[in-house]
Amino acid sequence: MLLTLLKCKLHKATVTHSELEYEGSCAIDGDLLDAAGILPYEQIQIYNIANGERFTTYAIRAEAGSRVISVNGAAAHKANPGDRVIICAYGQLPREEAARFHPRLVYLDADNRIVRTGSDIPVQAA
């Protein structure tokens, strides 16, 4: 049996552009894609912290160092410049491998600079 697990995430990215008249996708700074391990055209989930919207699209590579997070096409209705979002990619692994797997976690500041990276999400009590 294959289990679907969090492969990686960009945590609290700031949307820099929202382009409705675009073919689709989410353009992400190439350095951020590399840090997280997200490939161009890979399916991603975006969770908008500002409004609770959750949607699926695919990643495209923006210029490295640009700090761009551009939500494009129909998804532009779900995110505005300045919104903080969590961008996740998932993968499937056999149960035996899943038990040993750790995701790549990339934490960003409000300017889409990497603050820290990790592989475990700490438990947060309410």
UniProtKB/Swiss-Prot annotation:
UniProt name for this protein: Aspartate 1-decarboxylase
Binding site for substrate: 57, 73-75
Organism: Thioalkalivibrio sulfidiphilus (strain HL-EbGR7)
Subunit structure, interactors included: Heterooctamer of four alpha and four beta subunits.
Locations listed in the record: Cytoplasm
Gene, per the UniProt record: panD
The keyword Iron-sulfur appears for this protein: no
Pathway(s) the chain acts in: Cofactor biosynthesis; (R)-pantothenate biosynthesis; beta-alanine from L-aspartate: step 1/1
Record keywords: Autocatalytic cleavage, Cytoplasm, Decarboxylase, Lyase, Pantothenate biosynthesis, Pyruvate, Schiff base, Zymogen
EC number: 4.1.1.11
GO molecular function: aspartate 1-decarboxylase activity
